[in-house]
């Protein structure tokens, strides 16, 4: 036989907070998909810029790019 709850004290309702009330409209769009490509090209552009940024950082770290007037010493 399954256990049975005698009192309802264990059943609590969620407390409404200012943050929850503020963020609730953002969650109302959950599951909806915009037709077409949407913002995919924008995300691709952002990823390309990030890849360029990472390659520049790597070139600076490997001293492939020399920065005039800025001493770089790793050790």
Swiss-Prot record:
Matches recorded under Pfam families: PsbH (PF00737)
Q: Where in the cell is it found?
A: Plastid, Chloroplast thylakoid membrane
Q: How does it sit in the membrane?
A: Single-pass membrane protein
Q: Which GO terms describe its cellular component?
A: chloroplast thylakoid membrane; photosystem II
Q: Which parts of the chain span the membrane according to its record?
A: 41-61
Q: Which InterPro entries match?
A: PSII_PsbH (IPR001056), PSII_PsbH_sf (IPR036863)
Phosphothreonine modification, residue list: 3, 5
**Keyword vocabulary terms for this entry:** Chloroplast, Membrane, Phosphoprotein, Photosynthesis, Photosystem II, Plastid, Thylakoid, Transmembrane, Transmembrane helix
Recorded GO MF terms? phosphate ion binding
Tell me a GO biological process for this protein.
Answer: photosynthesis
- Post-translational modifications: Phosphorylation is a light-dependent reaction catalyzed by a membrane-bound kinase; phosphorylation occurs on Thr residue(s) in the N-terminus of the protein.
The domain of life is: Eukaryota
Tell me the function of this protein: One of the components of the core complex of photosystem II (PSII), required for its stability and/or assembly. PSII is a light-driven water:plastoquinone oxidoreductase that uses light energy to abstract electrons from H(2)O, generating O(2) and a proton gradient subsequently used for ATP formation. It consists of a core antenna complex that captures photons, and an electron transfer chain that converts photonic excitation into a charge separation.
Family according to the record: Belongs to the PsbH family.
Q: How does it assemble?
A: PSII is composed of 1 copy each of membrane proteins PsbA, PsbB, PsbC, PsbD, PsbE, PsbF, PsbH, PsbI, PsbJ, PsbK, PsbL, PsbM, PsbT, PsbX, PsbY, PsbZ, Psb30/Ycf12, at least 3 peripheral proteins of the oxygen-evolving complex and a large number of cofactors. It forms dimeric complexes.
Indicate what this protein is called per its UniProt record.
Photosystem II reaction center protein H
Q: Which gene encodes it?
A: psbH
């Amino acid at each position: 036989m399954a256990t049975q709850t005698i009192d309802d004290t264990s059943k609590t309702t969620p407390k409404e907070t200012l943050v929850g009330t503020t963020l609730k409209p953002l969650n109302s769009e959950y599951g909806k998909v915009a037709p077409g490509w949407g913002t995919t090209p924008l995300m691709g552009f952002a990823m390309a810029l990030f890849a360029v940024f990472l390659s520049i950082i790597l070139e600076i770290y490997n001293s492939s790019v020399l920065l005039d007037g800025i001493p770089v010493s790793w050790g």
